């Protein structure tokens, strides 16, 4: 590369010769992100991380070599329009070596008529092939699980990786909370960026909407609306909750899969982690000991967590109603029972 560049560039006065190895740029640690699974979700995540300039190198891993090579080439061919990022790919975990962040999107698809337990067991078998090798190649990495059922598989990844719980995170209800904020913003006719609102607990149908967490411009939304006698009744609240829970199903029913929203959701998590932003996100973390969840129940579910370069830096103690806390504990109990069936 140095010899070729010397044909185009000339050193400044008193500068090193173009080909001199000591003239390289001052050392800066490069950031590497690996994405395991090159399906619709994995590629949306890779594309979003690429366009947001979050990594110097992106490694793609998938079991289908031709599709993988095609996806990598498709991104590489856009190099003139994107930040300078090295894109590598392979079917072997060795390509992920020295990653800072490993995003796992691979997962077994449910067969019609298959039980939830059988699907979980097939996913565990898949994770046994994926997680230990990537953990071995990048022992200091952060592990971000996106595959569903995300809470159980985050637990599986934690057990199989041997990483501390602070470095194993599930995407959890980060996207659910984005949908929540969007729908509240639509109802109030404000920007979603000015709305704070959290969905917590198990990702999916049993996620818990924390109504008291809703604020707009720093003002508690429900109290302000009640004080001004504006409408935000129980029916409206329940309608929003149902729309949040059904959001993914609606998208899948219309286009066959979800991709872009989860891509942006994961990129927001990657930004907080890799750039040490210490922002609070509702993500799947080890929840034992929080909100009455037994210390002996090693379950992962979503709680507002402060994220930085070291992973989970702390979990916010929310002021939940008894009904919200009870629902959270029920989800934890169900997740714990499912995890016990996996024999990890």
From Swiss-Prot:
<dbReference type="InterPro" id="IPR011304">
    <property type="entry name" value="L-lactate_DH"/>
</dbReference>
<protein>
    <recommendedName>
        <fullName>L-lactate dehydrogenase B</fullName>
        <ecNumber>1.1.1.27</ecNumber>
    </recommendedName>
</protein>
<dbReference type="GO" id="GO:0006089">
    <property type="term" value="P:lactate metabolic process"/>
</dbReference>
<comment type="similarity">
    <text>Belongs to the LDH/MDH superfamily. LDH family.</text>
</comment>
<feature type="binding site">
    <location>
        <position position="179"/>
    </location>
    <ligand>
        <name>substrate</name>
    </ligand>
</feature>
<dbReference type="GO" id="GO:0004459">
    <property type="term" value="F:L-lactate dehydrogenase activity"/>
</dbReference>
<feature type="active site" description="Proton acceptor">
    <location>
        <position position="203"/>
    </location>
</feature>
<feature type="binding site">
    <location>
        <position position="116"/>
    </location>
    <ligand>
        <name>substrate</name>
    </ligand>
</feature>
<dbReference type="Pfam" id="PF00056">
    <property type="entry name" value="Ldh_1_N"/>
</dbReference>
<feature type="binding site">
    <location>
        <begin position="62"/>
        <end position="67"/>
    </location>
    <ligand>
        <name>NAD(+)</name>
    </ligand>
</feature>
<keyword id="KW-0346">Stress response</keyword>
<feature type="binding site">
    <location>
        <position position="109"/>
    </location>
    <ligand>
        <name>NAD(+)</name>
    </ligand>
</feature>
<dbReference type="GO" id="GO:0005737">
    <property type="term" value="C:cytoplasm"/>
</dbReference>
<comment type="pathway">
    <text>Fermentation; pyruvate fermentation to lactate; (S)-lactate from pyruvate: step 1/1.</text>
</comment>
<dbReference type="InterPro" id="IPR015955">
    <property type="entry name" value="Lactate_DH/Glyco_Ohase_4_C"/>
</dbReference>
<comment type="subunit">
    <text>Tetramer that arise from random association of LDH-A and LDH-B.</text>
</comment>
<feature type="binding site">
    <location>
        <position position="148"/>
    </location>
    <ligand>
        <name>substrate</name>
    </ligand>
</feature>
<dbReference type="Pfam" id="PF02866">
    <property type="entry name" value="Ldh_1_C"/>
</dbReference>
<dbReference type="InterPro" id="IPR001236">
    <property type="entry name" value="Lactate/malate_DH_N"/>
</dbReference>
<dbReference type="InterPro" id="IPR001557">
    <property type="entry name" value="L-lactate/malate_DH"/>
</dbReference>
<keyword id="KW-0560">Oxidoreductase</keyword>
<dbReference type="InterPro" id="IPR018177">
    <property type="entry name" value="L-lactate_DH_AS"/>
</dbReference>
<keyword id="KW-0520">NAD</keyword>
<feature type="binding site">
    <location>
        <position position="258"/>
    </location>
    <ligand>
        <name>substrate</name>
    </ligand>
</feature>
<feature type="binding site">
    <location>
        <position position="148"/>
    </location>
    <ligand>
        <name>NAD(+)</name>
    </ligand>
</feature>
<dbReference type="InterPro" id="IPR036291">
    <property type="entry name" value="NAD(P)-bd_dom_sf"/>
</dbReference>
<dbReference type="InterPro" id="IPR022383">
    <property type="entry name" value="Lactate/malate_DH_C"/>
</dbReference>
């Amino acid at each position: 590369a140095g010899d070729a560049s010397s044909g185009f560039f000339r050193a400044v006065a008193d500068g090193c010769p173009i080909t001199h190895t000591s003239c390289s740029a001052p050392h800066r640690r490069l950031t590497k992100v690996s994405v395991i699974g090159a399906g619709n979700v994995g590629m949306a995540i890779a594309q979003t991380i690429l366009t947001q300039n979050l990594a110097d190198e992106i490694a793609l891993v998938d079991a289908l070599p031709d599709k993988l090579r095609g996806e990598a080439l498709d991104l590489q061919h856009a190099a003139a329009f994107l930040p300078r990022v090295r894109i590598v790919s392979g079917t072997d975990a060795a390509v992920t070596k020295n990653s800072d962040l490993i995003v796992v999107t691979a997962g077994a698809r449910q067969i019609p008529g298959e039980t939830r337990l059988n699907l979980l067991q097939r996913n565990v078998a898949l994770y046994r092939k994926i997680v230990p090798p990537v953990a071995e190649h990048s022992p200091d990495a952060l592990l971000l699980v996106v595959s569903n059922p995300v809470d159980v598989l985050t637990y599986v990844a934690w057990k199989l990786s041997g990483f501390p719980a602070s470095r194993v995170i599930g995407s959890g209800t980060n996207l659910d909370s984005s949908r929540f904020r969007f729908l509240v913003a639509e109802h109030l006719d404000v920007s979603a960026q000015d709305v704070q609102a959290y969905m917590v607990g198990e990702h999916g149908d049993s996620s818990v909407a924390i109504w008291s967490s809703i604020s707009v411009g720093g003002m508690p939304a429900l109290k302000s609306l009640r004080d001004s006698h504006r409408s935000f009744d129980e029916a409206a609240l329940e309608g929003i909750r149902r729309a949040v829970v059904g959001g993914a199903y609606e998208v899948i029913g219309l286009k066959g899969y979800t991709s872009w929203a989860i891509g942006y959701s994961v990129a927001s998590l990657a930004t907080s982690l890799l750039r040490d932003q210490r922002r609070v996100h509702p993500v799947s973390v080890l929840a034992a000991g929080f909100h009455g969840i037994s210390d002996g129940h090693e379950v992962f579910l979503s709680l507002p967590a402060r994220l930085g370069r070291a992973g989970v830096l702390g979990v916010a103690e929310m002021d939940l109603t008894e009904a919200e806390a009870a629902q959270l504990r029920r989800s934890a109990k169900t997740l714990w029972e499912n995890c016990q069936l996996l024999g990890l």
